[in-house]
């Protein structure tokens, strides 16, 4: 990621005007409540607006980071030396009469809220997602899942803004730079989904999720709401409250990250104001005043301890971003 000092500030200010903000604190926008400031910050209000912003940033070869719910992201204490695009594209539209029934949502829409809206309409299929705090876009990129459900099991099609090649920049007649990119509709097969990953996650920076259509099934509001409450109740009993990023590590094949961390004797371990939860060892809690560095030190301590005891290298489920 380029340094903020290399960003073309005059061009960015001219292009985005008063929409472009500088030195914006990011901690309040993340579920862990840690991290520094965004050097530059702009809010996308719709999928078309998001596409337009990204078009400009790609065309100018400007580094950027898209932030949605901030629930799976650890922002460094020194902040993000790039343009942070805050995704507030949140339109949602249900098709109850369709075959199958479905919901279309822009990528900044809250995934858990959509599951509850579906329940009110007697539409099932997303009950597993009711407790997920992230956005539709993040779910599409990371193949979000819970309670044996995954995004890949619901996705019908997603609209993707695709940058073909980083060397596709070319000069226009006016002298401006223009990138080779286009809007495409991807079926679920194209994403190469596996456990908590996709082609979009494996090749970062080349694709932006604009919207997605998800498969639903007809049921009754009572049945769907009952299933949601069952899942939510289970989450309350097994997952700690407080500021966290959710599951810190992916579960290794045939085992659970939380079990390994607990067996390594790290439940309740604290560094600064950050703690490995005594309730569920795969959750790292900010008790107020923790830094990203505190959490990162716990991550490294955990990885080292689990590898030493079990020979297993835990893979992060969250994404560290920014400067450290």
Predicted regions and their residues:
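Anion-binding (especially nucleotide phosphate/pyrophosphate-binding) glycine-rich loop
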Residues: 2-140, 144
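Structural signature of FAD isoalloxazine-binding scaffolds in flavoprotein oxidoreductases
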Residues: 36, 42-47, 74-92, 141-164, ...
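Short, well-ordered alpha-helical segments in soluble proteins
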Residues: 118, 136, 140-144, 159-162, ...
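Phosphate/pyrophosphate- and phosphate-bearing ligand-binding catalytic cores of soluble enzymes
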Residues: 21-22, 28-30, 73, 161-165, ...
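Short, basic and Ser/Thr-rich N-terminal targeting/leader segments
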Residues: 60, 67-69, 154, 242-243, ...
